[in-house]
Amino acid sequence: MRYIRLCIISLLATLPLAVHASPQPLEQIKLSESQLSGRVGMIEMDLASGRTLTAWRADERFPMMSTFKVVLCGAVLARVDAGDEQLERKIHYRQQDLVDYSPVSEKHLADGMTVGELCAAAITMSDNSAANLLLATVGGPAGLTAFLRQIGDNVTRLDRWETELNEALPGDARDTTTPASMAATLRKLLTSQRLSARSQRQLLQWMVDDRVAGPLIRSVLPAGWFIADKTGASERGARGIVALLGPNNKAERIVVIYLRDTPASMAERNQQIAGIGAALIEHWQR
């Protein structure tokens, strides 16, 4: 009897560890919504099978903001694969073509940039003018939306150019997607025959080289983990990230997180997305 009593005491002694463990992903998302006084949309999808692992408001609309730039460069690469575009083609532009936040393109007014360089600038530095120049090559917002329909995404829509597309007005369906649709589209671009293997590798590499996502999931990523991502932001209470993650330096899952309608500061939005990412990673490791 004494032995049994000691075993029970030993077992109970371990329970506080479970009580004080980090919250499960959905618990963290609900906590984030409460702290943000806004809405969170999220999906975690297995890259190989397309199976949904975790989801919250996954079929609700959220502003894409700059996360659309991954899809845009996917559309550009599809044109390259079809022989209608070349990554080496030089595009020249003028001062009046520049919009706010163009840290790369503003330095190349004299010499222009290639299509490939514009894609790199749009994804790795979120250069808005680079995105607009690329958008013109695929037929503008309507052309990009048509590309989405062609690959089976009947939800995601782009209606405006940079920087107006970041307006993120409450209830506005323009320039929006759902976490589920964005994840499915990203998976198609990276795993199906919509793009050649070479173009898939190039799109993924641009996301790996992202240089403006440091405060989000990258800030909580364990050593040796893979990440490729693209973020988006709006002054009107929205923030977002699309990412591929995995241990052992392999892309195994797609994670899409969007926030909207929050009065929280950008730093607070970043912190909440990082917290959701940390909860997903910890749950994954169990």
From Swiss-Prot:
Cite the InterPro entries for this sequence: Beta-lactam/transpept-like, Beta-lactam_cat, Beta-lactam_class-A, Beta-lactam_class-A_AS
Q: List the disulfide bonds.
A: 73-119
| Biological process according to GO | beta-lactam antibiotic catabolic process; response to antibiotic
Q: Enumerate the GO terms in the molecular function aspect.
A: beta-lactamase activity
Query: Which chemical reaction does it catalyze?
Result: a beta-lactam + H2O = a substituted beta-amino acid
Matching Gene3D superfamilies? DD-peptidase/beta-lactamase superfamily
Q: Which UniProt keywords apply?
A: Antibiotic resistance, Disulfide bond, Hydrolase, Plasmid, Signal
Q: Keyword Hydrolase, does the record have it? A: yes
- Tell me which EC number(s) this protein carries: 3.5.2.6
Q: Where does substrate bind?
A: 230-232
Write the signal peptide boundaries: 1-21
Active site per UniProt:
66 (acyl-ester intermediate), 164 (proton acceptor)
Enzyme group, top EC level?
hydrolase
The reply to whether Disulfide bond figures as a keyword in the UniProt entry is yes
More details: The class A beta-lactamase family has a specific amino-acid numbering system, sometimes called Ambler or ABL numbering and often misspelt as Amber. A multiple sequence alignment was used to derive a consensus sequence and then the consensus was numbered taking into account insertions and deletions. This allows use of identical numbers, e.g. for active site residues, despite differences in protein length. UniProt always uses natural numbering of residues, hence there appear to be differences in numbering between this entry and some papers.
Q: Which family does it belong to?
A: Belongs to the class-A beta-lactamase family.
Q: What does this protein do?
A: This enzyme hydrolyzes cefotaxime, ceftazidime and other broad spectrum cephalosporins.
Query: What's this protein's name?
Result: Beta-lactamase SHV-2
The organism encoding this protein is Escherichia coli
Q: Which gene encodes it?
A: bla
